[in-house]
Every structure is written in structure tokens, then in C-alpha cells.
């Protein structure tokens, strides 16, 4: 018998924004102006430009985002009808030219799910990378590290690799847990700009499903102190 048991896979969902073509046509130019300017601001929060979801012209995008989150929940075999999604922050990210730095490894705090919508990309756009700090399969320290001259690895596979890359396809959205560490990586000379909309989502139970302990009650049932 020769069998490998694979367990506990992480899911990053990639789906289609069905209003993409019209949304891009109507909003691309104005969204460039909403860029949080990573050159001047350490984070989108520092710029104050984190409320894209409040703009009425973006309603179709967030309606489609809801459908995609429903699909993400379905893949996890969760009854999405029990939950409401609340976009807490949303912003525009831009790589204007080949000199723009890639996004450094980070995760998003104070939210449940995060998303990245690829409004404008091409084949040279930076890849989306998910990375893990520790690998449960690395049974000895430094076993999976690589060097120029000597290596214990014969090559990378799904068990020994600590970075997974996803191609940024225009018109699609990635949905993933906010505590997942991620970054972008440049693989080739960029030929065109890359415009994305990213954001954070809080997930709560609907107000009538407060008897479920697997989740947070709806904000309408909270008390602000």
C-alpha cells in the first residue's frame, strides 16, 4: 500500500464579477482618482480612501461580490442563507508602471473575509501569492530551504512549497480568510497598469438567526457603549 493522506486544505475562491465589462467602462477613470497612493500613505487606512462601497456607482460590483461570497460559502458546505455580509473597508490599488513596488506580505486585521477584484490586468501583472510562515510537513528545521549550491529538495510540490501563486485574471475576484498571509510578486516586466479593488468583509448571522452559536449576532442587535 502506498497512499498519501491530504488534509486541511486552505481555500481561496476565484469567481467572476458578472457586471465587469460595464463596470469597467463606466468607472475605470474615476477609480484611478480614488487610489490611496501607496507612495505617500503606508496603508489605505492612512489615506482615508477606504469607503468605496458607499459610492452608489459601485452597487452592481458589490451585488456581484455578494453572489461570489455565497459561492465561496457553498464550497465550504456552509448554509449562506444564515448570514449577512458587511463590507467594512474597500479601496483601490494600482500598479501604474514597471517601477511600482510589489505588495509586501501582510494580512488584514479586524475582518473575517477579504477580497481582491481585478478591474484591469494583463498577462504581465504581478501574481497574487499566498504564503505560510511554517509548514507542518517540514519535520526538520530548514529542510525546505533552498540555496545556490546545495539543496535537499529535488523540486517543489504541494507538500514542500510555502508559496502558492494565483494568476490575476481581469474580471475575477478572489475571496479568502482575512488572516491569510498574502502578497504580490513580479514575474516579468510590466507592460500596462494593474488596477484592483480590495476590501474587508465582516460576516454576521441574520437578525432572526440569533440562536445559532456559530457566528456573531447582527449589528442591529449590538449595543454601542
Q: Which residue ranges define each predicted feature?
A:
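A general secondary-structure signal for short beta-strands and their flanking turns/coil
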Residues: 8-10, 85, 110-112, 192-194
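Solvent-exposed residues in well-ordered beta-strands and their adjoining turns
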Residues: 16-18, 118-120, 200-204
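Non-heme Fe(II)/2-oxoglutarate
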Residues: 1-83, 91, 100-102
Amino acid at each position: 500500500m502506498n497512499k498519501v493522506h491530504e488534509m486541511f486544505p486552505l481555500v481561496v475562491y476565484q469567481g467572476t464579477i458578472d457586471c465587469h465589462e460595464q463596470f469597467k467602462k463606466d468607472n475605470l477613470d474615476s477609480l484611478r482618482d480614488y487610489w490611496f497612493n501607496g507612495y505617500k500613505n503606508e496603508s489605505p487606512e492612512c489615506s482615508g480612501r477606504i469607503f468605496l462601497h458607499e459610492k452608489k456607482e459601485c452597487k452592481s460590483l458589490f451585488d456581484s461580490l455578494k453572489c461570489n461570497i455565497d459561492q465561496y460559502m457553498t464550497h465550504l458546505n456552509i448554509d449562506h442563507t444564515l448570514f449577512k455580509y458587511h463590507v467594512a473597508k474597500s479601496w483601490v490599488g494600482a500598479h501604474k508602471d514597471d517601477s511600482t513596488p510589489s505588495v509586501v506580505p501582510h494580512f488584514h486585521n479586524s475582518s473575517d473575509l477579504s477580497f481582491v477584484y481585478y478591474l484591469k490586468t494583463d498577462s504581465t501583472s504581478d501574481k497574487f501569492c499566498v504564503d505560510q510562515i511554517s509548514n507542518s510537513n517540514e519535520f526538520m528545521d530548514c529542510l525546505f530551504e533552498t540555496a545556490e549550491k546545495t539543496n535537499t529538495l529535488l523540486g517543489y510540490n504541494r507538500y514542500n512549497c510555502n508559496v502558492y501563486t494565483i494568476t490575476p485574471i481581469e474580471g475575477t475576484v478572489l475571496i479568502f480568510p482575512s488572516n491569510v498571509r498574502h502578497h504580490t510578486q513580479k514575474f516579468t516586466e510590466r507592460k500596462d497598469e494593474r488596477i484592483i479593488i480590495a476590501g474587508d468583509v465582516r460576516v454576521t448571522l441574520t437578525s432572526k438567526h440569533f440562536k445559532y452559536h456559530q457566528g456573531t449576532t447582527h449589528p442591529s442587535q449590538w449595543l454601542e457603549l
